[in-house]
């Protein structure tokens, strides 16, 4: 397999293999043609994230950006059509150098979203400066559920009505076989109109004509009140049944949505991230997209062979968090407080005005300092520290790496090391005298 050249430098065999696998992953994602899906990569080094961004630039329909902070920073791949335009008009995280020739050899097809024509000189198919999304960036879940509930209530009333009809619509009265018993629907409609007001009763009386061509006699008028009362009871009972069915359906739908949300958090949420970290990660992803209802898809690529070993909190046990001190204190003041450990190599790394990291040369020194009490400040293990302090420590693992202690030596070993460094030769031992020639 030929090695790829990036920025005038050939990639190593491992990076070349990584780029080819990323291309296969992006090809598979592009074939799905689902705008609601985004591809989320695991935390990788800055070099591998850069290779992903440069590889994504070869796909005109895809866009890439990064989310997260520190060693938890991750790369996201999405479709170009749902990417929020950036302030400089480019959707990618990096701009191609001006010396490199452009990879675009013509305008791309304009998106079929009814957008206005792109002005001349602007790149077709991409967002340009001044363009704003056609839909709001974020719609609260409460409003979305209210809209869904409104649509669900109308569909429930239509679906649960007998024979596919709404009993409250008077237009359905008289339809069908004229010989059938239609007195009950007609009287029920009339009963509901009586509840509305006496003024509207006379207007709806012609609805009784389809029942029979002959007017009602005195005998039928005498039993009219009983039938109206029965029809009214039937209508109220049907209405209560509809309301109970609607409430039960909405409750089931709400429970189903909550279960789906929990499953999405369990399945899509990375195992290394807590629920709060995953919610922040999801919020940061949706802030970069015009489509808020998205599905996060994990990559099928096994990056374990490419991922560098990331530092953990257990590797930083010699680091403590210094807190609860006056903002006016300076580095010299903190070092003076830990003067006993300064000779061994104690260092200070600032987080903010009231928090700092104390880096001890060994675990024993850190454990000894934790047992003491200081008057002007407090200390605690990094595992119990604030989120900002942990992030600061994990961002600079080399700076916080435990320093190896110098091996003990003596004067003889020191002289030998100095002599070797200066290139001095040891005195050669005298060789024994050469024997004379052997007799013939």
Curated annotation (Swiss-Prot):
<dbReference type="InterPro" id="IPR012677">
    <property type="entry name" value="Nucleotide-bd_a/b_plait_sf"/>
</dbReference>
<dbReference type="InterPro" id="IPR001374">
    <property type="entry name" value="R3H_dom"/>
</dbReference>
<feature type="modified residue" description="Phosphoserine">
    <location>
        <position position="236"/>
    </location>
</feature>
<protein>
    <recommendedName>
        <fullName>R3H and coiled-coil domain-containing protein 1</fullName>
    </recommendedName>
</protein>
<feature type="domain" description="R3H">
    <location>
        <begin position="16"/>
        <end position="81"/>
    </location>
</feature>
<feature type="compositionally biased region" description="Basic and acidic residues">
    <location>
        <begin position="157"/>
        <end position="168"/>
    </location>
</feature>
<feature type="compositionally biased region" description="Acidic residues">
    <location>
        <begin position="257"/>
        <end position="276"/>
    </location>
</feature>
<keyword id="KW-0597">Phosphoprotein</keyword>
<dbReference type="Pfam" id="PF01424">
    <property type="entry name" value="R3H"/>
</dbReference>
<feature type="region of interest" description="Disordered">
    <location>
        <begin position="254"/>
        <end position="276"/>
    </location>
</feature>
<dbReference type="InterPro" id="IPR039884">
    <property type="entry name" value="R3HC1/R3HCL"/>
</dbReference>
<dbReference type="InterPro" id="IPR036867">
    <property type="entry name" value="R3H_dom_sf"/>
</dbReference>
<keyword id="KW-0175">Coiled coil</keyword>
<feature type="region of interest" description="Disordered">
    <location>
        <begin position="154"/>
        <end position="225"/>
    </location>
</feature>
<feature type="coiled-coil region">
    <location>
        <begin position="242"/>
        <end position="300"/>
    </location>
</feature>
<dbReference type="GO" id="GO:0003676">
    <property type="term" value="F:nucleic acid binding"/>
</dbReference>
